Amino acid sequence: MTLEQAELSRLLDILGNRNRRRIIELLREKPCFVTEISERLTISPKAVIDHLQMLEDARILGFRNDARRRKYYYLEHDISIQVHL
């Protein structure tokens, strides 16, 4: 497996999770912090943090801190996937 194939496989694994896709859809609307994501999607804060970490590690998300030291997550890039079989 080439490096490009491995990266694509990892990205597809990350995006294969429904909750991560829901988080991405929510962040398309506006930047959000963990509690906001948790409440809007009815997912535990711990699960949200785990999903956000994976998305951040894949460079799909970024974050910024506000004055209250809350992390606001946002999409780094618009995501579009095309599959050719």
Predicted regions: what they are:
Residues 39, 56-57:
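Alpha-helical residues within the helix-turn-helix
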Residues 23, 36-40:
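A short acidic, leucine-rich amphipathic alpha-helix
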Residues 46:
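Key DNA-contact positions within bacterial/archaeal DNA-binding proteins
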Residues 18-20, 29-35:
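Short capping segments at the starts of secondary-structure elements
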Residues 12, 69-85:
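Conserved segment of winged-helix/HTH DNA-binding domains
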Residues 1-12:
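Short, Lys/Arg-enriched N-terminal segment that forms or immediately precedes the first helix
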Residues 51:
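Residues within the DNA-recognition helix of helix-turn-helix
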Residues 57-67:
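Beta-hairpin "wing" of winged helix-turn-helix
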